[in-house]
Amino acid sequence: MKIKLTLFCFFICCLSLVHAQKFTLSGTIKDGENGEDIFDATVVVKELTNTGTKTNAYGFYSLTIPAGTYTFIYRMAGYDQKEITVELTENKQHNLELIPSKDIKNLQEVEVTAVKENDNITKSGMAVTTFTPKDIETIPVLFGEKDIVKTLQLTPGVKAAGDGNAGFYVRGGGADQNLVLLDEAPVYNASHLLGFFSVFNSDAIKDVSLYKSGIPAQYGGRASSVLDVKMREGNNKRFNVSGGIGLIASRLTVEGPIVKNKGSFIVSGRRTYMDLFLKASRKPELKSTKLYFYDLNLKANYNITSRDRLYLSGYFGRDNFSFNDEFGFKWGNGTGTIRWNRIVTEKMFSNTSFVFSNFNYAFDITSGGSKLKVGASIQDLNLKQDFDYFINNSNSLKFGFNVIYHTFKPGELKSTMSAINNFKIDNQYALEMGVYIQNDQKIGNWLSIMYGVRYSGFDYMGKGIAYSYDEKGKKTGEQEYGDFKTIKYHHFLEPRLSMSFILSEKNSLKIAYNRNAQFLHQLSNSSSSSPTDIWVPSTNNVKPQIADQVAMGYYRNFLDNMLVLTTEIYYKHLGNQIDYRNGASLFLNNEIEGGLVYGTGQAYGFELQFEKKKGKFTGWISYTLSRSLRKFKDINQGKQFPARQDRIHDLSVVAMYRINQKFALSGTFVFYTGDAVTFPSGKYEINGAVVPYYTERNGYRMPNYHRLDLGLTVYFKDRPKFEHNLNVSIYNVYAHRNTFMISFEEDKDNPGKTKAIQTSLFRLVPSITYNFKIK
């Protein structure tokens, strides 16, 4: 009897233990049409309240719950929901594909976005703009080329650097304070044709995320923002050919399986052909002129095992401008990324990356058989290791490290002209490193919090000569260092925090704080980014930039998430901002560090966006009220002055109207305060030469900027294996002369006085593009 009782008790204990045990369901979620990973998809348990998870950047999910039989619901905006029933008595792996909704594929009254319903309310992160190329396909742009950077410039807190310029400013920061990544590789110049296009071919892009505050701890190296651009992986089920033919540019994309359902590739190219039109010119010097750019995106991936996957991706872009074989100017980016994904356990995901990045430019002048050539470059080799660890359903841990070896070649001059000697600025070397840890935690159904810290270090090293300067910029000494010898080591702790207080399922209040250190600096004498800007490291003289930002936002959804209201305020303090002493020169200056001065800055503002996400009529209104100010001891008599990116008012209106299955209308309107600029206050003569006299830094304003663009997309009847449409757009419909530049010259009608000459780039610019896809 005692034995039976003991066995019975043992059986009850074992049964209780089984019920107390927890098991993990994990796997990957992919697109059922092309096999690409789906990021940020939701997996919830039907039988358990507030129990769920989301996929990471590679479509991996992990959910740990007590043993039992459950219904798992898989959701993603733009896809049909899928449910599966699983008896969970052990750890299991379940990979799944979601099928795009028929309404989405037929382009009916549903707006495709990467943001799920209420996701803007519940996520801990704030000030994140996310979209896919599909979201922007009808927005009218210059020359008819879809451009993710131009679209970002229509959102709050992001300001265009000017007409025909792909540079952008985020919350009062400089153009060089944005970390721009393409498949994890830094892009040091994101512009083509001096800024008329960005380097991102939308046919090769999967999704785009811009972080303005509460920046996750895995990102480091820039003071203001992170633009993370991910390339498409290619269709692993069938071959596709797509492309577009425009007035000045065309593009072509080929993708398909390497082995069906196991691996895929994508090759996407784009080229302008303005130089072909110049060949029709009657002027001989124009016939030989070259003016074009090209870019090529390549990517391949392969599943080695059910737990291991390899990626190889690259980007190669080049601009070429030459005039009559007398002057040539070339610049371009090259990047490469090798990645290894591994599902380490049911709860841990690993990504190991080796990244290469290079930017270089060169211009040459030919005269009388002699030639002069000037060039510069920056090159990175980067090793990254990231882990995602799903601790439980309330805590998701992310940690890792990266090490970057920078090589700076600031400038070299080679000449066959007898009057000019060859000259080279010494190369510079640095090792940048970062270690981070971050947890994304949910506390009940009322609070989401993401907190973490990043340690960043920067080792400025030899081989090279380190100079020292006094307070006035005069060189006082120099010391030579051998290979890999530390000249100066900088390091910082960078805390990151984002919190979302969920007031209801329709509204939330968010706060964020982040500190960012920046060790690389772009030196420019112009008012906007150009290919000849110089990248320099933090050294024993050049100080790292530091940015501390606090932000608060209120988010509200209306009418079943059809309308979305976002309001945010922010304050940013900027330390060790860089400017130039009066008369400083950047061109082939081996002692440029002596011409730099350091100060502080502050940026603050209010941002508002009201968006309609569903229905035939969609779009948004965004408005930013902001200031960006700087203060330097040696500039402007030590008084605070507006930064060149200081724009008080910035308004954008974007509207898209789906008339029917065949026609879609779109329009954008932009207005913003003119840039702060420095103009001469007077002039004087020295030995007969007129010299301008400057007083207040950035004490004047360019005229206010405004522009209306309209577009029409015609969708032709699709065939089973063929889709095509025609996009017609007009840039600057009412042909307003927006000022690009102001120069000064002597007034011939009134000698002794100076008059201002305004130069505009574009008035009315029509464009037409034919797009197609062969399945």
Please report, for each region that a protein language model flagged, where it lies by residue.
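Periplasm-facing N-terminal accessory domains of Gram-negative outer-membrane beta-barrel systems
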Residues: A20-E109, W446
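Periplasmic N-terminal accessory/gating domains of Gram-negative outer-membrane beta-barrel systems
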Residues: E90, E109-D176, L182-I215, R232
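A beta-strand signature from Gram-negative outer-membrane beta-barrel systems
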Residues: L96, L154-T155, V199-S242, R251-T253, ...
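Surface-exposed extracellular loop regions of Gram-negative outer-membrane beta-barrel proteins
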Residues: N360-Y361, T407-T416, D459-G473, E505-V550, ...
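Outer membrane beta-barrel strand-and-loop segments of large Gram-negative receptors
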Residues: D380-K384, K424, E432-G434, P537-K543, ...
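Signature of Gram-negative outer-membrane beta-barrel scaffolds
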Residues: V403-K506, F519, I635-G638
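Gram-negative outer-membrane beta-barrel transporters
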Residues: Y570-H573, I592-S681
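C-terminal beta-signal and adjacent terminal beta-strands/loops
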Residues: K662, F671-G688, Y705-D709, T713-K775
